[in-house]
Amino acid sequence: MMSQPAKVLLLYAHPESQDSVANRVLLKPAMQLSNVTVHDLYAHYPDFFIDIAHEQALLREHDVIVFQHPLYTYSCPALLKEWLDRVLSRGFASGPGGNQLAGKYWRSVITTGEPESAYRYDALNRYPMTDVLRPFELTAAMCRMHWMSPIIIYWARRQSEQELASHAKAYGEWLANPVLAGGR
């Protein structure tokens, strides 16, 4: 008997989604999978008033949490930062009694406006992407979640249609069975 694929909550945070070809292409396979819930934070919370109880309920219902967003000033868009600060609260995700996310999986899916070569100690951004994403990795650890290797689409605007299609195909295959497919 085959087990069901893990339930994935894909938290999508892009304030200008209509202008992001790469993110729209990446979302297409996710929207076709029955085990994936795509949750567009900017569509749900244009006023930034986050329904914390609703968001925490969504987190409880899923096994894998994917954070898909562009890299903004070496971090995430403002609404996702607000979401992280408000939803992953002490007593829910961390601290005494805060074990609701323990054992779940965290994966960041990031698009950037610069090439991979810009993320080195001797390059434009002065740090490799592993250092830039360290706050997210630490947040996952604080929540007792398993950190999975991030998916990074560098220089997203300069990716060809064929390259984006290839990324989307691989992403969709991973989303279909994320825990067995790995990514750590």
UniProtKB/Swiss-Prot annotation:
GO biological process, one term: positive regulation of potassium ion transmembrane transport
EC number: 1.6.5.2
Pfam families: Flavodoxin_2
Keywords from the UniProt entry: Cell inner membrane, Cell membrane, Membrane, NAD, Oxidoreductase
Cellular compartments per GO CC: plasma membrane
Disulfide feature: none
InterPro entries in alphabetical order: Flavodoxin_fold (IPR003680), Flavoprotein-like_sf (IPR029039), K_H_efflux_KefG (IPR023947), KefG/KefF (IPR046980)
Localization: Cell inner membrane
Catalytic activity of the protein: a quinone + NADH + H(+) = a quinol + NAD(+); a quinone + NADPH + H(+) = a quinol + NADP(+)
GO terms for MF: electron transfer activity; FMN binding; NADH:ubiquinone reductase (non-electrogenic) activity; NADPH dehydrogenase (quinone) activity
Record membrane topology: Peripheral membrane protein
HAMAP family, sorted: K_H_efflux_KefG
Family named by the database record: Belongs to the NAD(P)H dehydrogenase (quinone) family. KefG subfamily.
Known function: Regulatory subunit of a potassium efflux system that confers protection against electrophiles. Required for full activity of KefB.
Subunit structure comment from the entry: Interacts with KefB.
The protein's name in its UniProt record: Glutathione-regulated potassium-efflux system ancillary protein KefG
Annotated organism of origin: Citrobacter koseri (strain ATCC BAA-895 / CDC 4225-83 / SGSC4696)
Gene encoding the protein: kefG
